[in-house]
Amino acid sequence: MSKRWFVTGTDTEVGKSVASSALLQAANRAGYPSAGYKPVASGSEMTAEGLRNGDALALQANSGVALDYDEVNPYVFAEPTSPHIVSADEGRPIDAARLSDGLRRLEQRADWVLVEGAGGWFTPLSAEYTFADWVRQEQLPVILVVGIKLGCINHAVLTAQAVQQAGLTLAGWIANDVGGAPGRRHQEYLATLRRMLPRRCWAKSRTCRRPERAPLGQYLDISLLAQ
Protein backbone atom coordinates (compact mmCIF):
# COMPACT_ATOMS: atom_id res chain seq x y z
CA MET A 1 0.00 0.00 0.00
CA SER A 2 1.23 3.49 -0.83
CA LYS A 3 2.42 5.67 2.04
CA ARG A 4 0.75 9.08 2.34
CA TRP A 5 1.49 12.28 4.24
CA PHE A 6 -0.15 15.67 4.51
CA VAL A 7 2.09 18.73 4.51
CA THR A 8 0.62 21.70 6.37
CA GLY A 9 2.09 24.97 7.55
CA THR A 10 1.91 27.41 10.42
CA ASP A 11 0.54 29.98 7.96
CA THR A 12 0.38 30.71 4.26
CA GLU A 13 3.68 31.47 2.50
CA VAL A 14 5.84 29.59 5.01
CA GLY A 15 7.48 27.22 2.53
CA LYS A 16 5.17 24.21 2.22
CA SER A 17 6.05 23.83 -1.46
CA VAL A 18 9.78 24.05 -0.77
CA ALA A 19 9.46 21.36 1.90
CA SER A 20 7.19 19.20 -0.27
CA SER A 21 9.58 19.47 -3.22
CA ALA A 22 12.49 18.49 -0.97
CA LEU A 23 10.56 15.49 0.35
CA LEU A 24 9.65 14.35 -3.16
CA GLN A 25 13.22 14.69 -4.39
CA ALA A 26 14.62 12.80 -1.40
CA ALA A 27 12.04 10.03 -1.72
CA ASN A 28 12.66 9.56 -5.42
CA ARG A 29 16.43 9.52 -4.87
CA ALA A 30 15.99 6.87 -2.16
CA GLY A 31 14.10 4.60 -4.55
CA TYR A 32 10.51 5.42 -3.63
CA PRO A 33 8.72 6.77 -6.72
CA SER A 34 6.59 9.55 -5.28
CA ALA A 35 3.73 11.79 -6.35
CA GLY A 36 2.89 15.31 -5.25
CA TYR A 37 -0.75 16.27 -4.78
CA LYS A 38 -2.10 19.80 -4.33
CA PRO A 39 -5.85 19.15 -4.18
CA VAL A 40 -6.83 22.82 -3.87
CA ALA A 41 -4.82 25.86 -4.95
CA SER A 42 -5.69 29.53 -5.18
CA GLY A 43 -3.47 32.25 -6.53
CA SER A 44 -2.86 31.02 -10.08
CA GLU A 45 -2.00 32.46 -13.47
CA MET A 46 -3.59 31.91 -16.86
CA THR A 47 -1.31 30.15 -19.34
CA ALA A 48 -1.75 28.65 -22.79
CA GLU A 49 -2.68 25.39 -21.03
CA GLY A 50 -5.17 27.04 -18.66
CA LEU A 51 -4.91 28.18 -15.04
CA ARG A 52 -1.68 27.02 -13.41
CA ASN A 53 -0.57 27.35 -9.79
CA GLY A 54 3.15 27.66 -9.07
CA ASP A 55 3.10 25.35 -6.05
CA ALA A 56 1.28 22.64 -7.98
CA LEU A 57 3.73 22.99 -10.88
CA ALA A 58 6.61 22.46 -8.45
CA LEU A 59 4.98 19.27 -7.15
CA GLN A 60 4.37 18.06 -10.70
CA ALA A 61 7.99 18.72 -11.67
CA ASN A 62 9.41 16.96 -8.60
CA SER A 63 7.15 13.90 -8.74
CA GLY A 64 8.88 10.65 -9.59
CA VAL A 65 6.01 9.51 -11.80
CA ALA A 66 4.69 11.35 -14.84
CA LEU A 67 1.50 13.19 -13.92
CA ASP A 68 -0.85 15.47 -15.80
CA TYR A 69 -1.46 18.83 -14.17
CA ASP A 70 -5.11 18.01 -13.40
CA GLU A 71 -3.98 14.91 -11.50
CA VAL A 72 -1.79 17.04 -9.26
CA ASN A 73 -4.22 19.93 -8.82
CA PRO A 74 -7.92 19.18 -9.44
CA TYR A 75 -9.19 22.49 -7.99
CA VAL A 76 -7.34 25.59 -9.19
CA PHE A 77 -8.50 29.19 -8.68
CA ALA A 78 -7.01 32.45 -9.91
CA GLU A 79 -7.63 34.74 -6.95
CA PRO A 80 -5.14 34.39 -4.04
CA THR A 81 -7.69 34.08 -1.25
CA SER A 82 -9.24 31.43 0.95
CA PRO A 83 -10.60 28.53 -1.16
CA HIS A 84 -14.08 28.60 0.37
CA ILE A 85 -14.51 32.25 -0.65
CA VAL A 86 -13.35 32.00 -4.24
CA SER A 87 -15.09 28.67 -4.86
CA ALA A 88 -18.39 30.18 -3.68
CA ASP A 89 -17.86 33.27 -5.85
CA GLU A 90 -17.24 31.11 -8.91
CA GLY A 91 -20.02 28.61 -8.18
CA ARG A 92 -17.51 25.75 -8.03
CA PRO A 93 -17.99 24.00 -4.69
CA ILE A 94 -15.07 21.88 -3.50
CA ASP A 95 -16.20 18.25 -3.27
CA ALA A 96 -14.31 16.27 -0.61
CA ALA A 97 -15.10 13.03 -2.45
CA ARG A 98 -13.29 14.35 -5.52
CA LEU A 99 -10.24 15.14 -3.39
CA SER A 100 -10.27 11.57 -2.07
CA ASP A 101 -10.74 10.09 -5.54
CA GLY A 102 -7.70 11.98 -6.75
CA LEU A 103 -5.68 10.68 -3.83
CA ARG A 104 -6.74 7.09 -4.56
CA ARG A 105 -5.56 7.40 -8.16
CA LEU A 106 -2.14 8.65 -7.11
CA GLU A 107 -1.83 5.88 -4.54
CA GLN A 108 -2.15 3.37 -7.37
CA ARG A 109 0.74 4.95 -9.28
CA ALA A 110 3.30 5.92 -6.64
CA ASP A 111 4.96 4.37 -3.60
CA TRP A 112 4.64 7.61 -1.66
CA VAL A 113 2.15 10.47 -1.99
CA LEU A 114 2.85 13.92 -0.53
CA VAL A 115 -0.36 15.94 -0.16
CA GLU A 116 0.21 19.68 0.22
CA GLY A 117 -2.48 21.74 1.88
CA ALA A 118 -3.46 25.35 1.27
CA GLY A 119 -2.65 27.99 3.86
CA GLY A 120 -2.69 26.64 7.42
CA TRP A 121 -4.29 23.73 9.22
CA PHE A 122 -7.88 24.99 9.46
CA THR A 123 -8.20 26.48 5.97
CA PRO A 124 -11.92 26.29 5.05
CA LEU A 125 -12.95 24.44 1.92
CA SER A 126 -16.59 25.40 2.41
CA ALA A 127 -18.73 27.11 5.04
CA GLU A 128 -18.91 23.84 7.00
CA TYR A 129 -15.79 21.88 6.03
CA THR A 130 -12.06 22.51 6.50
CA PHE A 131 -8.91 20.95 5.11
CA ALA A 132 -8.36 19.54 8.61
CA ASP A 133 -11.69 17.68 8.35
CA TRP A 134 -10.58 16.04 5.11
CA VAL A 135 -7.18 15.06 6.53
CA ARG A 136 -8.89 13.50 9.54
CA GLN A 137 -11.25 11.63 7.21
CA GLU A 138 -8.27 10.26 5.27
CA GLN A 139 -6.24 9.60 8.45
CA LEU A 140 -3.10 11.14 6.97
CA PRO A 141 0.04 11.57 9.08
CA VAL A 142 1.00 15.24 9.17
CA ILE A 143 4.28 17.00 8.42
CA LEU A 144 4.36 20.55 9.77
CA VAL A 145 6.31 23.31 8.02
CA VAL A 146 7.24 26.14 10.38
CA GLY A 147 8.11 29.51 8.89
CA ILE A 148 10.82 30.82 11.20
CA LYS A 149 9.83 34.37 12.09
CA LEU A 150 8.38 36.31 15.00
CA GLY A 151 5.22 34.52 16.18
CA CYS A 152 6.19 31.11 14.82
CA ILE A 153 6.49 29.46 18.24
CA ASN A 154 2.87 30.11 19.16
CA HIS A 155 1.61 29.19 15.69
CA ALA A 156 3.62 25.96 15.61
CA VAL A 157 2.58 24.76 19.06
CA LEU A 158 -1.10 25.54 18.41
CA THR A 159 -1.00 23.69 15.08
CA ALA A 160 0.75 20.67 16.58
CA GLN A 161 -1.83 20.51 19.37
CA ALA A 162 -4.70 20.75 16.87
CA VAL A 163 -3.25 17.90 14.82
CA GLN A 164 -2.92 15.68 17.86
CA GLN A 165 -6.36 16.61 19.20
CA ALA A 166 -7.77 15.45 15.86
CA GLY A 167 -6.35 12.01 16.63
CA LEU A 168 -3.72 12.27 13.91
CA THR A 169 -0.01 11.57 13.94
CA LEU A 170 2.39 14.49 13.77
CA ALA A 171 5.22 12.75 11.94
CA GLY A 172 7.72 15.59 12.21
CA TRP A 173 8.38 19.20 11.31
CA ILE A 174 10.58 21.21 8.97
CA ALA A 175 11.94 24.67 9.77
CA ASN A 176 11.94 27.06 6.83
CA ASP A 177 13.71 30.41 6.74
CA VAL A 178 11.16 32.77 5.22
CA GLY A 179 12.81 36.15 5.63
CA GLY A 180 16.05 35.81 3.69
CA ALA A 181 19.02 36.02 6.06
CA PRO A 182 18.31 34.51 9.50
CA GLY A 183 17.35 37.09 12.11
CA ARG A 184 19.21 37.79 15.34
CA ARG A 185 16.98 35.45 17.38
CA HIS A 186 16.78 32.72 14.75
CA GLN A 187 18.71 30.07 16.69
CA GLU A 188 16.77 30.80 19.86
CA TYR A 189 13.47 30.35 18.01
CA LEU A 190 14.71 26.99 16.71
CA ALA A 191 15.87 25.86 20.13
CA THR A 192 12.50 26.75 21.65
CA LEU A 193 10.61 24.93 18.91
CA ARG A 194 12.74 21.83 19.37
CA ARG A 195 11.92 21.88 23.07
CA MET A 196 8.19 22.57 22.75
CA LEU A 197 7.15 20.54 19.71
CA PRO A 198 6.44 16.84 20.32
CA ARG A 199 8.41 15.52 17.32
CA ARG A 200 11.90 16.05 15.98
CA CYS A 201 12.90 18.64 13.39
CA TRP A 202 13.79 16.85 10.17
CA ALA A 203 15.51 19.67 8.33
CA LYS A 204 16.04 23.37 7.87
CA SER A 205 15.29 24.84 4.46
CA ARG A 206 15.07 28.25 2.87
CA THR A 207 12.35 29.67 0.66
CA CYS A 208 13.42 29.80 -2.99
CA ARG A 209 11.84 31.28 -6.09
CA ARG A 210 11.86 28.14 -8.24
CA PRO A 211 11.34 25.02 -6.07
CA GLU A 212 10.55 23.02 -9.20
CA ARG A 213 14.21 23.40 -10.22
CA ALA A 214 16.21 23.70 -7.00
CA PRO A 215 18.14 20.62 -5.74
CA LEU A 216 16.44 20.55 -2.34
CA GLY A 217 16.23 16.85 -1.51
CA GLN A 218 19.93 16.50 -0.73
CA TYR A 219 19.42 18.40 2.53
CA LEU A 220 16.72 16.09 3.88
CA ASP A 221 17.07 12.74 5.63
CA ILE A 222 13.91 10.73 5.02
CA SER A 223 14.95 7.63 6.95
CA LEU A 224 12.14 8.12 9.48
CA LEU A 225 9.52 8.25 6.74
CA ALA A 226 10.85 5.06 5.18
CA GLN A 227 10.36 3.05 8.38
UniProtKB/Swiss-Prot annotation:
One example GO MF annotation: ATP binding
Pfam family, one: AAA_26
Coiled-coil residue windows: none
Chief localization: cytoplasm
Pathway(s) served: Cofactor biosynthesis; biotin biosynthesis; biotin from 7,8-diaminononanoate: step 1/2
Binding residues for ATP: E13, V14, G15, K16, S17, V18, D55, E116, G117, A118, G119, N176, D177
Binding positions (substrate): S42
Physiological role: Catalyzes a mechanistically unusual reaction, the ATP-dependent insertion of CO2 between the N7 and N8 nitrogen atoms of 7,8-diaminopelargonic acid (DAPA, also called 7,8-diammoniononanoate) to form a ureido ring.
Subunit structure: Homodimer.
HAMAP family recorded: BioD (MF_00336)
The protein's name: ATP-dependent dethiobiotin synthetase BioD
UniProt lineage: Bacteria, Pseudomonadati, Pseudomonadota, Gammaproteobacteria, Enterobacterales
Gene name in the database record: bioD
